[in-house]
Amino acid sequence: MTRDLLPLSPNLPSDLLAEIEGARDTLAASKASSTRKAYASDWAIFCDFCDARNVEALPAHPDIVALFAHVQATGGTAPVTIGRRVAAINHHHKEEGFASPSARDAAGVIAHMLSGVRKKYARKKNQKAPAEAEKLMAMLATIEGDGLRAVRDRAILAIGMAGAFRRSELASMRLADLHFVAAGLKIDIPRSKGDQEAKGQDVAIPEGRFIRPVALLREWLKAAGLSLIDPVTGKPSPEPVFRRLTRSDLVTSAPITDKTVARLVKSTVTAAGLDASIFSGHSLRAGFLTEAAAKQASLFKMKGHSRHRSLDTVADYVRDAAMFDDHAGEKFL
């Protein structure tokens, strides 16, 4: 529940009431919808924890929050998730007009507990295998024919890897986001996981000579009869780029889902003779970064293309790709 900006009263002027409601909507947009949903779920979990132990959730004492973090860790919750849940608790307190537990005098216990949780319950990163260029081309080769499903699936894989897109970004891509230019294609990403302020970002995809992602996308648009301009309004079309197909392979108006991408990756890596258990929808995004790192692309260019917030995250792909380059034991092993 969001704290009121002003005490509401039916006696307030209607213009002021409308302004307050509008301001509430703006406040609600301060965090990505996925973050708001996660915070709401995290707060409910904390409330259940407090109810079961007959302690107060709001305002919560720092010791209770620290105990919550410990119990979560012993129950198998990942340290990163516990950190987010503590952030959700702090956020809810501030929303309700209370000092956050992490800002109170005895708050040091929370920071120390989180540090201990990270050290004691640290998990090895379970990274999925990247679909680099060679693997992606093997996956594309398994999709035979020129039917709508084959044409669509090839475009999804190629654009997904070429743009280092998240599954959700492929599913939410709209025709109005596409801009074909002489060098290839620019795709607008109105909002992404790392872009909570919704500034939007452009992703440039060259024509290419090997995977040819832009050509494969053009083939899908032509085969499905999709136009970037709405024929009725004359404006850029808000309709989805990648559509669901019926069982008889007819194009629908509904967008694919992120699960569509994940299933497509799994099925094509299996058909290519690869181990599907180590691949996921993220393999397309990871594949671009791993391939770019192997080709010694600029770290900053890679970060800009993948829209990562942290340069360290991108640097991990470079380290993985260069693990055997100039190896310390090369001259004696």
Each language-model region and where it sits:
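Extended, non-catalytic subsegments within catalytic or DNA/protein-binding/adaptor domains
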Residues: M1-L333
